[in-house]
Amino acid sequence: MFRMIQSLTPSLYDQDTFDTHFLRDMRKARYSIIIESPFIRLARIEQFLPVFKRLTSRDVRIIINTRRPDEHDTRYRTQAIIAIQLLQEIGVEILFTIKHHRKLAIIDREIIYEGSLNILSYYDSCEIMRRITSKAEAEMLIDFIKLNKFMEVK
């Protein structure tokens, strides 16, 4: 009759505090990480690459949804192509969505980060990211962004 409602535990981060918390959560991932970032910058990928390598070696599935490289500005297009190749070489799955502009991450179908910060291209701007721990919210978000079909067990 009564069901326990999982409480949301939100935290807010800015451009100076986001990476520390996000990297900590990623390192603890056991099953999967979804990152939606419309743009990809090579320097930013190089920051995350060691963590991604460790995760994929532990069979943590990483899915990145981004724009196609030809939708990047000319000066970033080549960077995006190189970065995507580096990611694919270590087993990261790349999805492309035309006109993509969402900025979010979902770790182990439970931890959500969402806000204004482009996770894979951030450089120098004023940003905000909210962290929420909720399996129900994560499942709703995965369904909403239509990534359930990519999250099936392989």
Outline where the language-model segments fall:
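Primarily the HKD phosphodiesterase
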Residues: 25-88
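HKD (HxKxxxxD) catalytic microenvironment of the phospholipase D
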Residues: 33, 92-138
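A conditional alpha-helix N-cap/helix-loop micro-motif detector
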Residues: 14-15, 44-45, 94
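A short, polar/proline- and glycine-enriched secondary-structure boundary/capping micro-motif
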Residues: 46, 75-76, 123-127, 150-154
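Cysteine/selenocysteine-centered motifs that mediate thiol-based redox chemistry or coordinate metal-sulfur cofactors
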Residues: 139-154
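Short acidic active-site motifs
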Residues: 21
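Conserved beta-strand termini and adjacent loop/short-helix elements that scaffold enzyme active sites
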Residues: 13, 65-67, 97-99
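Acidic/glycine-enriched edge-of-secondary-structure segments
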Residues: 1-16, 34-40
